[in-house]
A protein has these predicted regions:
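A short, glycine/Asx- and small/polar-enriched loop/turn
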Residues: 150-154
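Repetitive helical segments and hydrophobic/amphipathic motifs
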Residues: 12-15
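Amphipathic alpha-helical segments
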Residues: 23-144
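Bacterial N-terminal signal peptides that target proteins for export
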Residues: 1-8
């Protein structure tokens, strides 16, 4: 009797799942394609413009540090021990300052990138929600899927819906 009940439940579950999947509308979004969209590229350009002046200043400071190091190496034999020590410390302090400013710039860029990507992800999620409601999707999945039919790939719709 127990075997019959288990078999009955198994068959019923299989029939129910086959019937349920026939009514399920599924969509797929390829996030790598979304992240290569014009909207995502605009974020990169915006951040580049925002931080370009600081990056240029750091490039100039790096050139100055390198020039001073080169001059110090070249002129070190002509300097007194005290002068050499003072100039070496000066160059070392400049190099430390440069490294600190580079770290700060990297941190600031990462913070702003995370802020902008969160806004972008919110726009993507909003577009997905609008498309899901409008087109009657029951399930929309992102990324790692073994196989995706072109008929359920809604990536282009999502990209078109971002920011609307």
């Amino acid at each position: 009797m127990k075997k019959f009940a288990k078999l009955f439940l198994l068959v019923a579950a299989a029939l129910f799942s086959a019937n349920a999947s026939a009514e399920l509308k599924v969509g797929y979004i390829e996030m790598s394609q979304v992240l290569q969209s014009q909207q995502a590229q605009d974020i990169g350009k915006k951040l580049q413009n925002e931080f370009s002046s600081r990056a240029n200043q750091l490039d100039q400071l790096k050139k100055t540090v390198n020039d001073k190091r080169t001059a110090l190496e070249k002129d070190s034999k002509k300097m007194s021990e005290t002068e050499l020590r003072d100039k070496t410390k000066q160059v070392s302090d400049m190099a430390i300052d440069l490294e600190r400013k580079q770290r700060e710039l990297t941190e600031d860029i990462n913070i702003r990138k995370n802020e902008e990507m969160k806004k972008f992800q919110d726009q993507v999620n909003k577009a997905v929600g609008v498309i899901a409601q409008a087109d009657g999707y029951d399930l929309i999945v992102y990324n790692s899927v073994a196989y995706v039919s072109k008929k359920i790939n809604i990536t282009d719709k999502v990209i078109a819906g971002i920011g609307k």
